[in-house]
Amino acid sequence: MGMGERVSATGLCAALYAIGSFLTSYLVSPFGRGQFRPAVVLPAIFSIVYGPGVGGLGAAIGTVIADSMKHGSLYLPSLLAAAPGNFIGFYILGKLTRRDFNWRKFSIASQISLWIGCATVAYLYTIVISLLGMLPPSLTPEDLFMLGTSLTLWFFITEYPFVILLVPPILRALKFRGELKGGPSWLISLAIPGAIFLTISLMITFTPASSEILRGLIVKLNPSYALSTLQLIQLLFAGSGAAMTIVGLLLQVRGA
């Protein structure tokens, strides 16, 4: 693919991702930070079809545009945190799926790239907004680490199902390298990640140490709604984990 085509594809990716991200930008995590963003499907497709550079750069530009549109001016946390994380995540996805594209590779690559990308965004974002004075000064380094970890989990759990369920049929519709080689392993794709989230749900619900640490962070961030926020987080992990596990097992049995 020539330079002109790469530039055009990158611009299209950025524009579509910006529009898709802006449409859900007001749906945020229970912490009041971090957006619900199913639009990650778009740069994922561009990374696989046009290469890691196109998807990564398009995602970085698109997220800055979307966040800046929401806030009415250039949004520094997006430029300094979301852009690098988006670029790294989708660049890795494109790199890992460049050759011998198959279901197993796509599933594993999606999980690896999203975990790395989500963690990069979350921890950088936490550091940046703390330095900019956008968080309560009472937050300790441990609180900031917990917030970064919680946002990482939020990003992944609200983005991964869309990638794993929507990207393959879209690639088929685009006739990208023919059909995906091999059948989908829904155990690897959905059931195992779902079981992990169920485990996290049990930990933050029934383990006193974990629940108290999380409760302490929530009280500092939003004291008026601390209990309801904690319950919402527990429900999010339990519901998402159960749904992913059950759907993964059913699809695996059906395809067997």
Residue locations for each model-derived region?
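Loop-helix junctions at membrane interfaces
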Residues: M1-A256
